[in-house]
């Protein structure tokens, strides 16, 4: 049975977190946590928290083998955007997009 954890509306762009999710997909949970611990990215901290939450969900729901849990799904989807205007020369304005993402991790 798969145990899942989600972080909706994470305040980071999905393109920054997706490569980290690709690193841990298919790994055992302890190994994936070790990989994320030594990544120098802010998204690694977020992904690490979601992975720990998925492991805690498995423990809480009575998973039979906690030592052999594997990451079966690590998905990062795009979320909503805040749009801000940055004043530019000659009365113009450029749109600055503050991107959000949804981080989903399943272990089995």
At which residue positions do the language-model features occur?
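Structured, basic alpha/beta domains of bacterial-type, RNA-associated proteins
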Residues: 1-23, 27-108
């Amino acid at each position: 049975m798969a145990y899942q954890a989600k972080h909706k509306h994470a305040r980071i762009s999905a393109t920054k977190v997706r490569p980290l999710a690709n690193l841990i997909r298919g790994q055992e949970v302890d190994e994936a946590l070790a990989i994320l611990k030594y990544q120098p990215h802010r998204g690694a901290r977020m992904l690490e928290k979601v992975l720990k939450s998925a492991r805690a969900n498995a423990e809480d729901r009575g998973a039979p083998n906690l030592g052999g849990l594997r990451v079966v799904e690590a998905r990062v989807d795009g979320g909503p955007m805040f749009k801000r205007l940055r004043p530019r020369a000659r009365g113009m304005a450029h749109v600055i997009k503050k991107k959000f993402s949804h981080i989903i991790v399943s272990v089995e």
